Amino acid sequence: MEEIRFCPEHGFYRGEKCRCGAEGELILPKEKVEKLGKFISGVLRHFPDKFGLNMDENGWVNLESLARVVKRRYKWANIWLIKALVYSDEKQRYELKGDKIRARYGHSIDVKLSDFPEAKEDVLYYGTSEEEAHRMLEIGIKPVNQRYVHLSTTIEKSKEVASIRTDTPIVLEIDAKKAREDGIRIIKANDLIALAEEIPAKYIKRQIVFNQYSSS
């Protein structure tokens, strides 16, 4: 987890130096970035009701209400720091719109996300282990502990996700175009992630096998 800094020209960013080379003002040190990120992710993805937040069917909550919840946990937190977390997040975990905020993906609670755009990619990818890949080739890809199946727009991202759990990642190539034509709803959460309620096995085109020593 990297610190958050502010560049007068480019705004909030993660790390010691901005892309322009400037060493901006320190906004949040690493340990506070981690605490704030974990707490907000938990609230927006898993337990808004626990903190009395009213969440609509698309995952939106009021930003000021969230800030009050966060401040009860961390006295140093405020809306400005929440915005710094969102705008500097290269993984695009969150979305701000006016006076509302939501998590873009990772939900375990029932959210519809009906205002997300349809994913336009013809091919998408799902990273997994060898054992799980065999099962998915038979029964399809279903969500585990999350509301949606999380697909990647690139092979590299899928491999990265799978490599967290196994030394021999498998990437399943999904015929997203055919799935959409057949009525499977696939939505775009951000530049790297698409979501679907499930992917039946017939849309898995092939599997790509890697090992811990492979570079591609």
Curated annotation (Swiss-Prot):
Superkingdom classification of source: Archaea
SUPFAM superfamilies hit by this protein: ADP-ribosylation (SSF56399)
Gene: kptA1
Family of this protein: Belongs to the KptA/TPT1 family.
Top enzyme class: transferase
Enzyme Commission number: 2.7.1.-
UniProt keyword terms in alphabetical order: NAD, Transferase
Example GO biological process: tRNA splicing, via endonucleolytic cleavage and ligation
Record HAMAP family: KptA (MF_00299)
A Pfam family that the UniProt record links to this protein: PTS_2-RNA
Chain's role: Removes the 2'-phosphate from RNA via an intermediate in which the phosphate is ADP-ribosylated by NAD followed by a presumed transesterification to release the RNA and generate ADP-ribose 1''-2''-cyclic phosphate (APPR>P). May function as an ADP-ribosylase.
The protein, known as: Probable RNA 2'-phosphotransferase 1
Source organism (scientific name): Archaeoglobus fulgidus (strain ATCC 49558 / DSM 4304 / JCM 9628 / NBRC 100126 / VC-16)
PANTHER family in UniProt: PUTATIVE PHOSPHOTRANSFERASE (PTHR12684), TRNA 2'-PHOSPHOTRANSFERASE 1 (PTHR12684:SF2)
GO molecular function: NAD+ poly-ADP-ribosyltransferase activity; tRNA 2'-phosphotransferase activity
